[in-house]
Amino acid sequence: MASSGLGNGVGTSRSAKGLKSSSSSVDWLTRDLAETRIRDKVETDDERDSEPDIIDGAGAEPGHVIRTTLRGRNGQSRQTVSYISEHVVGTGSFGMVFQAKCRETGEVVAIKKVLQDKRYKNRELQIMQMLDHPNAVALKHSFFSRTDNEEVYLNLVLEFVPETVNRVARSYSRTNQLMPLIYVKLYTYQICRALAYIHNSFGLCHRDIKPQNLLVNPHTHQLKICDFGSAKVLVKGEPNVSYICSRYYRAPELIFGASEYTTAIDIWSTGCVMAELLLGQPLFPGESGVDQLVEIIKVLGTPTREEIKCMNPNYTEFKFPQIKPHPWHKVFQKRLPPEAVDLLCRFFQYSPNLRCTALEACIHPLFDELRDPNTRLPNGRPLPPLFNFKPQELSGIPPEIVNRLVPEHARKQNLFMALHS
């Protein structure tokens, strides 16, 4: 389990992609790009906040008891809840995530503990309080804690999900197997559905989609996006930091230092995840910010002047060597369904405005199998909930798109759809 995305993409051999490890053009490109101002440093942006309520303690050592008070709802009195720390499941620059159990109910949760500057609002907490979706990890409640040296931490109590897509994918790689296509479809569809929700309902960009940030129930295969620590509501015309998103999944406009990017960066990252699940390893395993662009160009070919302008107008005069795109059948060294190739092509557009949206991806023919009422998991069990749409998800979507999005058998089962069909 990891209710926060931890770690970077794992290293990989490039030979499995059928790509040459070097060429004169690629070597030239690497040397020349190293002299450009492509950014590869950490930046932050935050907002002010008021003084929080704080409890003492909240250690993550096994057996440590954390007591906090929940605010009453609907006139109910405040309630004291105790959690027993079980073990740390991940650490990172943000803090740590540990598994805990509620003493009162026996429920297992994940607690994400992050260092908090009391002068600032915590954007992740604000975002988590907004979200309510079957493919986004749920926030149960939160509290602040203080250590002996007066450091203040925010503790996000999250639903427990036992696995990550990263670990599931690695379990196949270790045995030299590829993930069954039905799972690739299921995971990719659920990522797109979650992104359609946050992009369309809030203008929210996750900014760190990667296998480590995708929780999955190994029995039902329901997927939930987690770790909204980098997420932000993007406002047109307002600049954002460009050093965002883990390297292997970083859209090219970010590598070019664009600051007025869009939610299309999440779409690129989703393509990287899908390709990795199909390939068994990262598609673009760059060793640095510059090398990341080299890896992309080796597969997609050199971007045109117009494509570069769409990513960052400041680079239009830069002279790139002309490298032809690598055929997808050679990249994957196996026969992919044409629908899978088509969707990858829609994800991997240099021009952000030419990438498909998350909603468009959801209605793509690749996922028609998931809309078939007879489709089952390989073990014979039913698929996880895929079409339990809430009104907020479907708001403003034309009826003809809704009809393609929600199959007839699901509409019959859904009271909301029955009332609004």
Swiss-Prot record:
This is Shaggy-related protein kinase kappa. GO terms for molecular function: ATP binding; protein serine kinase activity; protein serine/threonine kinase activity. May mediate extracellular signals to regulate transcription in differentiating cells. InterPro entries: GSK-3, Kinase-like_dom_sf, Prot_kinase_dom, Protein_kinase_ATP_BS, Ser/Thr_kinase_AS, STKc_GSK3. Its EC number is 2.7.11.1. The keyword Amino-acid biosynthesis does not apply. Residues 43-54 have a biased composition (Acidic residues). The active site is at residue 208. The lineage of its organism: Eukaryota, Viridiplantae, Streptophyta, Embryophyta, Tracheophyta. The keyword Protein transport does not apply. The gene is ASK10. ATP binds at residues 89-97, 112.
